[in-house]
UniProtKB/Swiss-Prot annotation:
Enzyme Commission number(s): 3.6.4.-
Lineage: Bacteria, Pseudomonadati, Pseudomonadota, Alphaproteobacteria, Caulobacterales
Keyword DNA damage: yes
One protein family per Pfam: RuvB_N
Main location: cytoplasm
Name of the molecule in the record: Holliday junction branch migration complex subunit RuvB
Entry keyword annotation includes Kinase: no
Origin superkingdom: Bacteria
Positions annotated to bind DNA: 294, 313, 318
Annotated residues for binding of Mg(2+): 69
Similarity annotation: Belongs to the RuvB family.
Enzyme class: hydrolase
Entry's localization field: Cytoplasm
Amino acid sequence: MTRIISGEAQQGEQIPGASDRALRPQTLAEFVGQEQAKANLRIFIEAAKGRGEALDHVLLFGPPGLGKTTLAQIVARELGVNFRATSGPVLNKAGDLAAILTNLEANDVLFIDEIHRLPSTVEEILYPAMEDHVLDLVIGEGPSARSIRIDLAPFTLVAATTRAGMLATPLRDRFGIPIRLEFYTPKELQHVLLGAARKMGAPLNEDGAAEIAARARGTPRVAGRLLRRVRDFASADGASVIDRKAAGMALARLEVDELGLDSLDRRYLRALIENYGGGPAGVETLAYAIAEARDAVEDVIEPYLMQQGFIQRTPRGRMACGKAYLHLGLTEPVSAPKAVQGGLFGED
């Protein structure tokens, strides 16, 4: 399911081109937002450099699109060491990871994205590598099999995940520096957008940036994606500046409303309210009603709607809150629950 307001990386975004790399911050000072995380990282990095040691292993976790990969690259750059990147899904065999680990130089940074998708057989050889800087491998099969131990150079594993709860406890406990990345405030996203627009040569003013930021779901990746499409519309319309009006018109054509909901979000809410009286309705029923897979409904559509107080998940099923009726311009029944908004910019 491809949505312009999805925080997940889309095709072509996983491997950024030269122009995309130019838009990314290169240092902690340039990185906007995540102030507490940056302050702590700066201290840990300086301490490790002062001792001439590898930085302790870092786990970056939180919703997609908040800059985990960029932050991992910055860590390596601030340490002045090499950066190697891979991801959990591509490390199918223990040998795949062993080949990478044995080629690391002292204090290098290895980045593993989506570490929650690492196969258990690969994960097991990571434990001694992280803790003791050794690699324990079994060579051969059956009675002739033998184990060998390979010493590794000290290194820093920086891992990223959107599902920290799926990590095995032994793996999670080996990260000395766990860092949760939070959603961005509209002001922070406005800053990100203005900086990106300058590098892109897009004529975006502060009001235009504020309009895009308000609809970007607290996610820099979404903000950047919206900026590119708004720039396209502005260019096609011959606009000399992307102000609030130009940005609003472009976003309306993209069907992203003032609260960051797209047509799929609104279709879900309408199905819940108009087909099932506002609920409770089961997720399977709702998925069938909007012709989407259950996993897509649970993982892609519902999280933001719950965070923003549009729906509640109850033991009996999903229920529409008063905010959903108001947003769709429908009459709110007395029985509609008043959800406590989880807060996009707080704990989710």
